[in-house]
């Protein structure tokens, strides 16, 4: 990725009230985006958001900027990120904009864009928007100003889209499911999708108040879901993150099922049904157990850089239709254009219903290697800790000790000043010790 001033790996993100997530910046961003994107004739932009309290302020600022550039805004209200991608396509809009910081706490927020075809904006377009932001705002003539309106049936449209990805001949009537919506954008979508497909649904994390998004609930913290699945004796649990582009599951025994395992289940089922084309794309963080399990099935596997945009790029490069991150981003190009937690979860449920198998049994063909991840915060602008000789030396020692039976991955977060230290191998105690040894070296820099 080229050096850009504002856009990171997943749009623009930060703490609300601090640059760049301020009303004046977002207004100018809306204007600059309008200038760059107003080229296809519809002059409409879809704007969706998650349930953060700051979404009201930021959508108003975006709308003002777009209107000044002559584009009209169509508001969806709280809506999952993949729903905005879908609605952008179906409305033939110039673009879709999502106001969300995904799995981050409520005091963060962000802006990300979708192209007219429902895919994330290419780097070149983001760079063009940044270049436009260096100019002074100019307002179009009064008669050409944009308008604002709401899509009153946005939720219903997306619910029907999700249900259409589930086979007509199957039902969820035999399943008791706990669904955790992270007090986020899926709160009024996912429970209804599952109920309408016949499931007995117990909903948690479905009472957003503007400040409780991702707070001890959702895909990034499944403890509440695990406890509820066990207490209710449910068949499984499904957790989404704040904006609904991630899914993590829990089996009837309370075991966490991550994005690697979800992709394994979907890929294997696609192979069984004769629908899998090509291979599967993971990331540098994908578990070695996934790679080995797919190879045993004869399914090619390749790793992309971390980030769902890079998974998608690799999928397009290979002509493959399935990719995922272990964090729960699952991209199924035969179904949609971006990571969609609800759609991915439905494909796992279809495999359960079709084969009359539990989630636990569907995972049994894949042995997960212990994988320890330690996040180390560093001071932005103080140099690259990964280039320090002491960090390189400790990393080399660990890699030599693991040999071919494990891996080490050090990388910077694309959205926060964090170094992510990942060590993977056969022995959990050993990889834990190795991960903390490297993390200590990073902290000491």
From Swiss-Prot:
The note on cofactor binding and number reads: Binds 1 Mg(2+) ion per subunit.
Q: Which Gene3D superfamilies match?
A: Alpha-D-Glucose-1,6-Bisphosphate, subunit A, domain 3 (3.40.120.10), Alpha-D-phosphohexomutase, C-terminal domain (3.30.310.50)
* PTM characteristics: Activated by phosphorylation.
Q: Which InterPro entries match?
A: A-D-PHexomutase_a/b/a-I, A-D-PHexomutase_a/b/a-I/II/III, A-D-PHexomutase_a/b/a-II, A-D-PHexomutase_a/b/a-III, A-D-PHexomutase_C, A-D-PHexomutase_C_sf, A-D-PHexomutase_CS, Alpha-D-phosphohexomutase_SF
Record keywords: Isomerase, Magnesium, Metal-binding, Phosphoprotein
- Needs which cofactor? Mg(2+)
Q: Which PANTHER family match?
A: PHOSPHOGLUCOMUTASE (ALPHA-D-GLUCOSE-1,6-BISPHOSPHATE-DEPENDENT), PHOSPHOHEXOSE MUTASE
This protein is called Phosphoglucosamine mutase
Q: Kindly list the organism's lineage.
A: Bacteria, Pseudomonadati, Pseudomonadota, Gammaproteobacteria, Enterobacterales
């Amino acid at each position: 990725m080229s050096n850009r001033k504002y856009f990171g790996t997943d749009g623009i993100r930060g703490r609300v009230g601090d640059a760049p997530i301020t009303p004046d910046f977002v207004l100018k961003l809306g204007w600059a985006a309008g200038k760059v994107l107003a080229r296809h004739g519809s002059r409409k932009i879809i704007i969706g958001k998650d349930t953060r309290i700051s979404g009201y302020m930021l959508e108003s600022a975006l709308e003002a900027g777009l209107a000044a550039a002559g584009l009209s805004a169509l508001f969806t209200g709280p809506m999952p990120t993949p729903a905005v991608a879908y609605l952008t396509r179906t409305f033939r809009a110039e673009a879709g904009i999502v106001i969300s910081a995904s799995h981050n706490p409520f005091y963060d927020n962000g802006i990300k864009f979708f192209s007219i075809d429902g895919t994330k904006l290419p780097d070149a377009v983001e760079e063009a928007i940044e270049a436009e932001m260096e100019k002074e705002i100019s307002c179009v003539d009064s008669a050409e100003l944009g308008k604002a309106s709401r899509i009153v049936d946005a939720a219903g449209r997306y619910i029907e889209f999700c249900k259409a990805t589930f086979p007509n001949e199957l039902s969820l009537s035999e399943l008791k499911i706990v669904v955790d919506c992270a007090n986020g954008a899926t709160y009024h979508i996912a429970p209804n999708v599952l109920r309408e497909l016949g499931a007995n649904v117990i909903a948690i994390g479905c009472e957003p108040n503007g400040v409780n998004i991702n707070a001890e609930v959702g895909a990034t913290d499944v403890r509440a879901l695990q406890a509820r699945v066990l207490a209710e004796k449910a068949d499984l649990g499904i957790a989404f993150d704040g904006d609904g582009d991630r899914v993590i599951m829990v089996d009837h025994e309370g075991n966490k099922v991550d994005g690697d395992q979800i992709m394994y289940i979907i890929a294997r089922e696609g192979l069984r049904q004769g629908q899998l084309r090509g291979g599967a794309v993971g990331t540098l963080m994908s578990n070695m157990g996934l790679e080995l399990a797919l190879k045993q099935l004869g399914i090619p596997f390749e790793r992309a850089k971390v980030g769902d945009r890079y998974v998608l790029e690799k999928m397009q490069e290979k002509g493959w239709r399935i990719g995922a991150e272990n964090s729960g981003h699952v991209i199924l190009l035969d179904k949609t254009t971006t990571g969609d937690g609800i759609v991915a979860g439905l494909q796992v449920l279809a495999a359960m219903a079709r084969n009359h198998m539990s989630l636990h049994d569907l995972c049994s063909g894949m042995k997960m290697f212990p994988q320890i991840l330690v996040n180390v915060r560093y001071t932005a602008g103080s140099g690259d800790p990964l280039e320090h000789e002491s960090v390189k030396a400790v990393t080399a020692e660990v890699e030599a000790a693991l040999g071919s039976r494990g891996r080490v991955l050090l990388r910077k977060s694309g959205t926060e000043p964090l170094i992510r230290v990942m060590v993977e191998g056969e022995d959990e105690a050993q990889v834990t010790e190795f991960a903390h040894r490297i993390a200590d070296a990073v902290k000491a820099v």
